[in-house]
Amino acid sequence: MKKLVTIIFLLNLILASANSMQPDVFVQSTVNRASEILSKNISREEKINGLKIIAKQTVDIIGVGFYSLGSARKNLNNNQKQKYFDLFEDYFLKSFSSRLSEYTNPKIEVQSKKFVNENYTIVNSVLVSTSDRPEVKIDWRIYTKNPDNPLIRDLIIEGLSLARTQKEEFTSILNSNDGDINALFRTLENFTKN
């Protein structure tokens, strides 16, 4: 009986690890899905909507939002936090999908991965050069705390962290408005309306 329990336990472990998606496979799959949308002969609006769906499924928008807000999040009440995350999600999805929708048939090749710790893996890739653009190095910071649901936490393009850049921008807005969170809310609202 003890051997049977051990065998069942080992089989469950093997099946669980087989079902969890490796970060590099996750990135390549995500890139392939986005590339398929961008390659279609559909309107820009349809491309943006398709990219938003992919982002909601693959990006840790809440985690990126918390990070982008920095220490200011400690001063917010629950209503302000909820308002921030609603605004941030709209802002993030519009910013992300609008930028990507300009690309036609981008080819990204995953090259390697580096295990950082049980929560993070860095996946290294390149946006393949074309006659119109040079090769671009893209590193993906993948949150792997739940191996069955890896999520993108950051993109580092040619050494520049998009999450860190976002955090610096939000900090600047807050600092230039005496820490008034409503100034950041207005900025996010204005961006999503335009």
Predicted regions and their residues:
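Surface-exposed, charged secondary-structure patches
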Residues: 94-136, 187, 191-194
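Solvent-exposed loop/turn segments at secondary-structure junctions
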Residues: 73, 90-91, 129-130, 158-162
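Sec-dependent N-terminal signal peptides
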Residues: 4-14
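Short beta-strand edge/turn micro-motifs at domain boundaries
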Residues: 135-137, 141-164
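Early exported N-terminus immediately downstream of N-terminal targeting peptides
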Residues: 20-100
